[in-house]
Amino acid sequence: ALYNLMSHVDFNLGVYYPEGGMSGVADGIAELAEELGVEFRTNHPVEWIHGYRGGFKVETGGETDVLADVVVSDADYAHTEQELLPPEKRQYDADYWESRTYAPSAFLLYLGVEGDVEPLAHHTLVLPSDWEDHFGQIFDDPEWPDDPAYYLCVPSKTDDSVAPDGHSNLFALVPIAPGLDDTPEVRDEYRDLVLDDIAQNTGVDLRDRVVVEERFSVSEFTERYNSYRGTALGLAHTLRQTSLFRPPHRSDALDGLYFTGAFTTPGIGVPMCLISGEITADSVLEDA
């Protein structure tokens, strides 16, 4: 019933689109934070977090480590615990993370193409007549789906700023099992499969119109975001991984360490992660 409410919001109440794309949400938050005195240090990957003189020292591999009273991690929860903390300060061991059920990864195909893409709307779902095989290939017998269900998004249908005149901006998102091997050869084959399927099922042939193309899949989720097994979303919303059964915002093993993001409550998705940030901020203030 809880997740049916989410479908009601999406399909009946409608959703908002940030002008310029989803990065506009992050840009807006960053702009507000800087107005409030926050300093951002980019390209400083965190390598270690440990207690230091009643607070924390965060080692970034740069010339200057960061000293802090509290630390809030929005990184992959498993990565923070397993790779950035000493063993005695971890809440969970490797067996815990290995035994969790993870939400799908994804094969994402980003395209800039010549011309329009009628009749595609801003949001289009393409579903095979029987999608059980696809979901079985995600959760039961992990492998690349041979007849996939997928989502098409065409932001240029709504926002003129994301594509030049006479062109369209779109992406295809195919849910896949986390941890799959996505070699260049596999990605090439799957790219062709997706474009063929789009042409067959929507009547929109993009194959000879591509001007710009990027691909993003398991490897990128792992390398760019340190995502456990390359999941795109974190812990799946199973009954035993919902609400209080998700990892906490406050570390039980290290006072002053907090977590936020998709692994925590309320869960996965941009709105959920923003709410998670509010919960974590309230927790920090309560403990101050």
State each model region's role:
Residues P145-C153, V204-P266:
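A glycine-rich dinucleotide-binding beta-alpha-beta segment and adjacent secondary-structure elements
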Residues E47-P164:
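Mid-domain catalytic core of redox enzymes
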Residues A262-L285:
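A conserved FAD-binding loop/helix module that cradles the flavin
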Residues G51-G55, P86, T183-E185, S217-G230:
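Short glycine/threonine-rich loop-to-helix capping motif typified by GTGT followed
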Residues V72, L111, A172, I198, ...:
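Hydrophobic, well-ordered secondary-structure elements that form the walls
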